[in-house]
Amino acid sequence: VAIVTGASRGIGADIARRFAAEGANVAIVARTLEPGAGGLAGSLAEIAEQIRASGGECLPIQANLADPIDRARIVPQAVEHFGRLDILVNNAAWSRFVPIWEAQPKHFHLAFQMNLHAPQELSQQALPHLRAQGEGWILNISSATADRPPSSPYDEDDRYICFNRDGHATLYGTTKAALDRLTAGWAVELSRENVAVNALAPVGAVASEGAVAVGGWDERDHIEPVEAMAEAALQLCHRPANELSGNIVRSLPLLERLQVSVRGLDGR
């Protein structure tokens, strides 16, 4: 049984579909329950229908990950429905891509609530259930923006320099860098237990609904298929927990290292 947050669209939805194709029962979590209810295409109802149509079991859980009250009911609701929990994927995220000097306190608060507090609290709630199974997996979805930009003198032709300067990813990247450190800490503190904790990010941009809506990214840059993230997530959440833990990794290099090819979301 897996919980996947931010699963009404994009990377989260595709991870849920890939897990279901391998036989996992999935609880999918997001704010948008019905089609047309959110600002972007995609909803829990649509993803659940796709999973069920392929023979999978799915529980949609409508919740706002920025709300501590909503966060507190996600794990209990999934466990009550399925009777167990094996995997937690913390994918939901938020940011405002504005010049950092224009970012408001409310932007910082919401970004840290979604991108750091939610993974921390859900992991705390999930851990007793993972321990009860004797093995478990926690996967935090990070971002290449967590990488610190190099110092001056700045290379005007450097892709990452240009993205950070013009894409205003400082707030988002700061929360994801904190998430990477949190991941490494969870992993080492659980190193004597059979619970793997890893962070996974795409190499570059993924053309998800959210990324397209944000805009400002160059289609000539490396665009990674969402299937690569879904396949890499599967590898980090089904291999023996003591085999892969404490990794802060990018999807395509991980798959190359493990000598695993990218499959479709249906597992084919």
Indicate residue ranges for each PLM-predicted region.
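Conserved glycine-rich Rossmann-like NAD(P)H-binding loop of the short-chain dehydrogenase/reductase
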Residues: 22-46
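C-terminal helical subdomain
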Residues: 177, 192, 199-200, 216-268
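A short, exposed helix-loop element centered on a Lys and neighboring polar residues
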Residues: 123-124, 184
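Conserved glycine-rich cofactor-binding loop
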Residues: 8-9
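Catalytic loop of short-chain dehydrogenase/reductase
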Residues: 137-192, 204-206
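Substrate-binding pocket helix/loop in short-chain dehydrogenase/reductase
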Residues: 99-100, 107-109
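The beta1-alpha1 cofactor-binding region of Rossmann-like NAD(H)/NADP(H)-dependent oxidoreductases
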Residues: 42, 62-74, 105
